[in-house]
């Protein structure tokens, strides 16, 4: 089975012996995740903006319908 304690010791030893190599490896490993997070955040922001715009449009339409019904009633 995989020994987590031995692996953690190896990683700590590697980070102590070669900090620049360790940081480079960590940054290279995490960069795609950061990029994916940025893209997904941007898409979510666009979806939220579109939903809010659509809700405002529907609200305006409902107000205009109600206004037209009031004028027609009078």
From Swiss-Prot:
Pfam families for the chain: UPF0542
Coiled coil location: 42-74
Disulfides per UniProt: none
Biased composition (Basic and acidic residues): 55-66
Subcellular compartments: Membrane
Transmembrane segments: 20-40
Origin: domain of life: Eukaryota
Cellular compartments per GO CC: membrane
Membrane topology term: Single-pass membrane protein
Annotated spans, Disordered: 55-74
Major subcellular location class: membrane
Family matches, as InterPro entries: Smim15
Keywords of this entry: Coiled coil, Membrane, Transmembrane, Transmembrane helix
Family the UniProt entry places it in: Belongs to the SMIM15 family.
Protein name: Small integral membrane protein 15
Organism whose genome encodes this protein: Homo sapiens (Human)
Taxonomic path: Eukaryota, Metazoa, Chordata, Craniata, Vertebrata
């Amino acid at each position: 089975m995989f020994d987590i304690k031995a692996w953690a010791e190896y990683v700590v030893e590697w980070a102590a012996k070669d900090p620049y190599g360790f940081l480079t490896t960590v940054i290279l490993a995490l960069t795609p995740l950061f990029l994916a997070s940025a893209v997904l955040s941007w898409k979510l922001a666009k979806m939220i903006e579109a939903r809010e715009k659509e809700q405002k449009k529907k609200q305006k339409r409902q107000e205009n319908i109600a206004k037209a019904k009031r004028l027609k009633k009078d």
